[in-house]
């Protein structure tokens, strides 16, 4: 997994135009950690993260919030005591854009597997 996506920044949704097609998604996915999955309808990328305790989970969630704020692109999160599930989709286009992959790559940089 080598990615320069993490060094890029998100574009305004108004300037993107259209969601990515399946070929574009297929080309971008290998640039992320292999634990990221694309839903069958190609509208969402998602990944589950596990932690030792609530404190580590919330520290991770806060780091995601910081990235989301800086990039002005926000994931859907499901958070529990020792887990966080992250889902990215560009809601304005009802599908995936480069923004989703950029933010996923930035999240990948937070943790060492």
Curated annotation (Swiss-Prot):
Keyword Membrane assigned: no
Reaction equation(s) it catalyzes: (4aS,6R)-4a-hydroxy-L-erythro-5,6,7,8-tetrahydrobiopterin = (6R)-L-erythro-6,7-dihydrobiopterin + H2O
Keyword Chloroplast among UniProt keywords: no
Gene Ontology biological process terms in this record: tetrahydrobiopterin biosynthetic process
A molecular function GO annotation: 4-alpha-hydroxytetrahydrobiopterin dehydratase activity
EC number: 4.2.1.96
Top enzyme category: lyase
Sequence similarity: Belongs to the pterin-4-alpha-carbinolamine dehydratase family.
Record-given protein name: Putative pterin-4-alpha-carbinolamine dehydratase
Organism: Legionella pneumophila subsp. pneumophila (strain Philadelphia 1 / ATCC 33152 / DSM 7513)
């Amino acid at each position: 997994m080598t990615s320069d996506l993490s060094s890029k920044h998100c574009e305004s949704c108004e300037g993107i135009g259209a969601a990515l097609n399946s070929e574009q998604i297929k080309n971008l996915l290998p640039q992320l950690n292999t634990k990221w999955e694309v839903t069958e309808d190609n509208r969402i990328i998602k990944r589950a993260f596990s932690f030792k305790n609530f404190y580590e989970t919330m520290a991770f969630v806060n780091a995601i919030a910081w990235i989301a704020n800086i990039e002005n692109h926000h994931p859907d999160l499901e958070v529990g005591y020792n887990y966080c599930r992250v889902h990215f989709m560009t809601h304005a286009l009802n599908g995936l854009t480069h923004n989703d992959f950029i933010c996923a790559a930035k999240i990948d940089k937070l943790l060492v597997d």
